[in-house]
Amino acid sequence: VVRKYNIDTIYNLAAILSATAELNPMLGWNVGIGSLVNCLEVARVFGCAVFTPSSIGAFGPNTPKDMTPQDTIQRPNTIYGVTKVTGELLSDYYFTRFGVDTRSVRFPGLISNLTLPGGGTTDYAVEIYYSAVKGEKFICPLEKGTFMDMMYMPDALDAMVDIMEADPSKLIHRNSFNVTAMSFDPEILYNTIKKYIPTFEMEYKPEPIKQAIANSWPNSLDDSCARNEWGWNPKYDLDKMSVDMIETLRAKLGK
């Protein structure tokens, strides 16, 4: 495909998400790392650039929780996180050893109004909007006070394009940049949605696997390196995202 269509940049998005990967660790490893190695080898042979997303899952319980630095201890305790750290190191290796133009960002939880949740620890932040728009009580799988970074999908797509178009001479870091747009816990998200859907109700029923994963991740990220090195600047905050999510889902669901 790369040869036939003269591809210059490969976006490798294959992964089994965090909670699902814990149920089948080897599948998580094989999908996450197997796909990356294939892409890196193709890029080495044909001279392509490669973008592979990392994640806040690349951090672990010993990582500083608040304003997590760009360069810090990682040591994740999930197979998803292990694949992400491995991916960061492999990508850097292919850059330094073979000159492959590898770049990456550590995505927070991504919130989409198009794609349904798929087994991630942060997926509650998508599911909650569906419940609110449908007029259903939301059962939250995480405890009150569980803060995590999040980002609306339009900003995530911008980040994927912008980093690959950035001037390489300005990139001190490559694999992988902290990026974020907002940080909240379920209660803050619930109260934000209630401003627009006052009858919305939520009940807490934490799921042990998801809660343990969330507890090992940062509360907030320092993304100053991304802002300084390639101009990262998200457009959506929590309120702006919530308005757009609710409007889009109402149209999508006919509510």
What does each model-identified segment do?
Residues 27-29, 66, 72, 77-88, ...:
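Short-chain dehydrogenase/reductase
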Residues 92-147, 153-158, 162:
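NAD(P)-dependent short-chain dehydrogenase/reductase
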Residues 6, 10-12, 30, 37-79:
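Conserved Rossmann-fold NAD(P)-dependent oxidoreductase catalytic core, especially the SDR/UDP-sugar
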Residues 33-39, 83-91:
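Conserved catalytic Lys-bearing alpha helix of Rossmann-like short-chain dehydrogenase/reductases
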Residues 19-27, 61-66, 116-117:
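Conserved catalytic-core motifs of eukaryotic protein kinase domains, centered on the activation segment
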Residues 12, 49-54, 58, 103-109, ...:
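Structural signature of the Rossmann-like NAD(P)-dependent dehydrogenase/reductase core
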Residues 1-31:
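NAD(P)H-binding glycine-rich loop region in Rossmannoid oxidoreductase-like domains
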Residues 141-143, 148-255:
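C-terminal substrate-binding subdomain of Rossmann-fold SDR/epimerase-dehydratase oxidoreductases
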